[in-house]
């Protein structure tokens, strides 16, 4: 959550009560890295924002199922989805809104801030074994299959951390990697 989201909520408040479709951990993990806070923690934060009357689980990046289920008079979204991978979801949302007479309100994107940038900044701070262990437990609950790779040295670790592919609008990347002490010491010419 960042000030761009707050700007969006403030503008949406002008149209009435606000129901937020909050992506579940599973939905986020299928497109990018698992969020720092779990769904319940994020929900608690969002439902305490002024003007938010309801928070519902959004199981997928496709808004159409929630739009068909809740049939809001208006759907507010930032203009960042006009192009790129989110554009297909925009078209599906417009189609769902049209089916029952809902209206799309596109609010100008707040420049200079993004969740991805904030995640990268948090990653640069570092982590602890306890945080890594807790993240692994959450990943095991959020995804049916995890992708891990063994790394032999710091360079291959950096590659594993940053490599990804996009297929069918889904970003695939490694969920984690490990390096054995035996491999590390062997590379240094000092086997255990």
Q: What is each stretch, according to the model?
A:
Residues 25-28, 154-156, 182-187:
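Short active-site-proximal "capping" loops at secondary-structure junctions
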Residues 168-192:
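Glycine-rich, proline-tolerant flexible connector loops at the mouths of alpha/beta enzymes
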Residues 20, 147-153, 175-180:
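Hydrophobic faces of well-ordered beta-strands that scaffold small-molecule active sites
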Residues 1-131:
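Nucleotidyltransferase catalytic core that binds NTPs
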């Amino acid at each position: 959550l960042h000030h761009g989201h707050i700007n969006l909520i403030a503008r949406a408040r002008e149209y009435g009560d606000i129901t937020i479709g909050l992506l579940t951990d599973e939905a986020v993990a299928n497109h990018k890295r698992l969020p720092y806070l779990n769904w319940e923690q994020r929900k608690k934060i969002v439902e305490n924002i002024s003007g938010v009357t309801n928070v519902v689980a959004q199981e997928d990046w496709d808004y159409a199922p929630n739009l068909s289920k809740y049939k809001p008079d208006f759907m507010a979204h930032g203009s960042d989805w006009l192009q790129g991978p989110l554009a297909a979801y925009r078209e599906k949302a417009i189609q769902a809104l049209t089916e029952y007479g809902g209206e799309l309100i596109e609010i100008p994107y707040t420049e200079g801030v993004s969740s991805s940038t904030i995640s990268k900044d948090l990653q640069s701070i570092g982590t602890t074994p306890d945080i890594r262990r807790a993240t692994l437990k959450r990943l095991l609950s959020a995804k049916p299959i995890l992708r891990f790779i063994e790394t032999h040295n710091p360079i291959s670790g950096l590659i594993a951390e940053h490599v990804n592919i996009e297929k069918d609008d889904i970003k695939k990347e490694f969920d984690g990697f490990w390096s054995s002490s035996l491999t590390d010491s062997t590379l240094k010419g000092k086997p255990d």
